[in-house]
Design a protein with these regions (language model features):
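Ligand-binding clefts of soluble mixed alpha/beta catalytic domains
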Residues: 1-239
């Protein structure tokens, strides 16, 4: 259920932590609301959003701090996605995160795109975020430059081509927009604008995870005794 997302409990320095992470790769015959489809890891679909929502709720019940590890290209879009109510499920996940009152840490390993970045524990949509970490490969944006340029100028290119006009000036504007988007999604810019609190080397990530976990368990207002009283659970498919 929700194969694009990994949700589970881990022990860090002997302490329980909830982990949510994107899973990469092709997902055959998925999502279920599209016939003969092939899902792409890193994108969020209906089941994955439901899965994360329930996992956040369970972590909140047992007062288990959470770490979000994201490499996402966004939430699925299109008519089928609208019918599957992905927007509402994303809103529900944000609501659950906000009301969990759990200390959370977010790591953007590579891509953090659009609303998926927010619902995966991103600081822009999470008041409980203790801090966010980026890497040398981090890119955070609303969409990539090529997509933005195509959305902005495709119609104009079609009209100019029909009119027999020179396409060069419009293509130059598209390239300029792509370059601007690329520059403003680089790690240094993300840190400068506060999208992440710090850019760290990959081997150093564990130290930050340890520091967050140890700090979370020293806060009596966030942790209660039942956090060790876990019961076996499973997130079931609707079928």
């Amino acid at each position: 259920f929700g194969p694009e997302m990994i949700c589970g409990i881990a022990k860090i320095d002997g302490l329980l932590v909830g982990i949510v992470a994107n899973k990469q790769g092709l997902l055959m015959n998925y999502p279920e609301y599209k016939e003969n489809s092939v899902g792409v890891g890193g994108k969020l679909y209906r089941q994955g959003l439901i899965k994360m929502n329930e996992f956040v709720t369970l972590c909140a019940r047992d007062r288990i701090p959470m770490i979000w590890i994201q490499d996402t290209t966004g939430i699925d879009v299109g008519d089928d996605a609208e019918v599957a109510e992905l927007l509402g499920l994303g809103q529900s996940l944000i609501y659950s995160i906000q009301n969990s009152d759990l200390p959370m840490m977010e790591i953007t390993l590579r891509k953090g795109t659009a609303a998926a970045h927010y619902v995966l524990g991103g600081p822009q949509g999470n008041d409980t975020n203790a801090f966010s970490i980026g890497t040398a490969a981090t890119e955070i944006n609303v969409m990539n430059g090529e997509t933005a340029a195509a959305a902005m100028y495709t119609g104009k290119l079609v009209r100019e081509k029909k009119a027999g006009k020179d396409l060069g000036p419009t293509i130059d504007k598209m390239n300029a927009m792509i370059n601007d988007y690329n520059e403003k999604s680089k790690p240094a810019f993300c840190a400068k604008m506060g999208f992440v609190d710090e850019i760290v080397k990959m081997p150093a990530l564990r130290n930050y995870v340890l520091a967050f976990t140890d700090a979370a368990y020293q806060n009596p207002e966030k942790i209660c005794p039942i956090h060790q009283m876990l019961l076996p659970r499973i997130i079931r498919d609707e079928k």
